[in-house]
C-alpha cells in the first residue's frame, strides 16, 4: 500500500530510522520533536516514496525508541530501512494550542515583514543545527537568509493571518535597519 506522494508538501517529518535492533525486525527510531508515547497514536507513517509503515509495537529502552513495523520481521529487512525518514500529515497533530503556540511546519510560507511593515520575503524553512532554532527566509531578492528564531529577532507571529514580523537588526540581517530596502531594490534591479 502506498501514500499519495503528491501530498508530501503537507507532510511533517516525524522520525528517522537509525538502525536495526535485535533479530526480530525491530528498529531504533530517532524522533524529531515528538514525545515517544505519542508516536503510536499517529497510526500509519509513510516515507518519501509513499510506502506505509504501520506500528505493531513500540517501547522505550535506554533513551531509545524501539519500534516494530508490520511486515518487518527480520534483521536484514530492518537493516535495509536505516536512514528512512518517516512522515505524518500535518492535520494529524492536535490543534488545541494556546494563542502563542504553533507547530514549526505552520511557519513555512508565512510572509515576513520588518517592523516598518515592509515585505522582506517568506519563511521557507526551519532548522536547528545545535545552537538554536533558525528560520530560513527567502527574501524578495530571491536570496535566502537564516535568522535566529528568538523573541528579539521575531517579535510577532500571526499564523492565522499568514505573517510574522522580523526586526532586521536583531535578526542580524543588517546593521542599519534602512539598508534592507536599498539592498533588496538593488538585487531586484540586477535581476
Curated annotation (Swiss-Prot):
GO cellular component term, pick one: cytoplasm
SS bonds (residue pairs): none
Superkingdom to which the source organism belongs: Bacteria
Stretches assigned to the PRC barrel domain: 99-172
GO biological process: ribosomal small subunit biogenesis; rRNA processing
Compartment annotation: Cytoplasm
Pfam families named among the record's database cross-references: PRC_RimM, RimM
Keyword annotations of the record: Chaperone, Cytoplasm, Ribosome biogenesis, rRNA processing
GO molecular function: ribosome binding
Subunit structure and binding partners: Binds ribosomal protein uS19.
Entry remark concerning the domains of this protein: The PRC barrel domain binds ribosomal protein uS19.
Record function comment: An accessory protein needed during the final step in the assembly of 30S ribosomal subunit, possibly for assembly of the head region. Essential for efficient processing of 16S rRNA. May be needed both before and after RbfA during the maturation of 16S rRNA. It has affinity for free ribosomal 30S subunits but not for 70S ribosomes.
NCBIfam families registered for this protein in UniProt: 16S_RimM
Family affiliation: Belongs to the RimM family.
The protein's name in its UniProt record: Ribosome maturation factor RimM
